[in-house]
Design a protein with these regions (language model features):
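A short beta-loop-alpha structural element at the N-terminal edge
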Residues: 1-16
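Conserved acetyl-CoA pyrophosphate-binding loop and the N-cap/start of the following alpha-helix
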Residues: 95, 99-107
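Conserved beta-strand-loop-alpha-helix junction that forms the acyl-donor binding cleft
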Residues: 96, 121-131, 147-156
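Conserved GNAT acetyl-CoA-binding A-motif
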Residues: 105, 112-125
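Conserved acetyl-CoA-binding loop of GNAT-fold acetyltransferases
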Residues: 135-145
């Protein structure tokens, strides 16, 4: 398994990983894959690599991308302030729970720091088991609503 930056021609995989990132509570029917075509979700992958803050680390298992952590400056669910990138992360189900997501997060935080960013935000549903991983890598809750936390990580200098 290697961790590397996403190559521009590989950017279409982010659409698939965005679908994988959708938290589906126990007993709830998964949404159609077309949900990622909604304008508020296309923000996460459309024309990725064309803007400042479009950074991505992938987990590559013998040539197959099995996970991705990416950031983008956008007005999304996790938006906190202008100029602060929002983060998304996803792994295929069979690779979860093995520490790969934590490594992806650390690598992306390093890449953000190298690119001059000092903070990054995300939105996560309160029931999502990934909340613990986000806290473990340094994210703190800055606001919440009935269903979600908005979290920010200060990237150490």
């Amino acid at each position: 398994m290697i961790f590397r930056e996403l190559e521009k021609h590989e950017a279409p995989v982010l659409k698939d990983f965005l679908y994988e990132a959708i938290f589906i509570p126990e007993g709830v029917e998964p949404p159609e894959r077309s949900i990622v075509e909604r304008p508020e979700l296309k923000l996460y992958y459309e024309d990725f690599g064309s803007s400042t803050g479009d950074l991505c680390i992938v987990a590559d298992d013998n040539g197959k991308i099995i996970g991705a952590a990416w950031s983008r400056i956008m007005n999304d669910y996790g938006h906190v302030e202008d100029g602060m990138p929002s983060l998304a992360i996803s792994l295929y189900k069979e690779y979860r729970g093995q520490g790969i997501g934590t490594t992806l997060m650390h690598k992306l935080l390093e890449l953000l720091k190298e690119n001059g960013f000092t903070r990054v935000s995300l939105a996560v549903q309160k029931e999502n088991y990934a909340v613990r991983m986000y806290e473990k890598v340094g994210f703190k809750t800055v606001s919440e609503n009935e269903l979600e936390y908005i979290m920010v990580c200060i990237i150490n200098s």
